[in-house]
Amino acid sequence: MQEMVGYLIKYPNVLREVMEGNACLLGVDKDQSECIINGFKGLEIYSMLDWKY
């Protein structure tokens, strides 16, 4: 799962699509996918995916 999180950080456009429900994470089950998405939502990411400090 750590590799998937790293990939989503590297490619924020993919993260955006996954969070909007327009894409899914291959090889990741629904529970893991929801966990990853909720983790990013918990970081208070702006709509342009700039990190909020």
Curated annotation (Swiss-Prot):
Gene Ontology cellular component annotations, sorted alphabetically: extracellular region
InterPro entries: Competence_ComX_Bacillus (IPR009233)
Propeptide positions: 1-46
Key words, A-Z: Competence, Lipoprotein, Pheromone, Prenylation, Secreted
Lipidation (3'-geranyl-2',N2-cyclotryptophan): W51
PTM text: Trp-51 is modified by geranylation, which is essential for activity. Modified by the tryptophan prenyltransferase ComQ before export to the extracellular environment. The type of isoprenyl derivative differs among the different pherotypes and depends on ComX primary sequence.
Pfam families xref list: ComX
GO MF annotation: an example: pheromone activity
Protein's cellular compartments: Secreted
Role summary: Part of a major quorum-sensing system that regulates the development of genetic competence. Acts through the activation of the two-component regulatory system ComP/ComA composed of a sensor histidine kinase, ComP, and a response regulator, ComA.
Subunit details: Interacts directly with the sensor histidine kinase ComP and stimulates its activity.
Name this protein carries in UniProt: ComX pheromone
Lineage: Bacteria, Bacillati, Bacillota, Bacilli, Bacillales
Gene that encodes it: comX
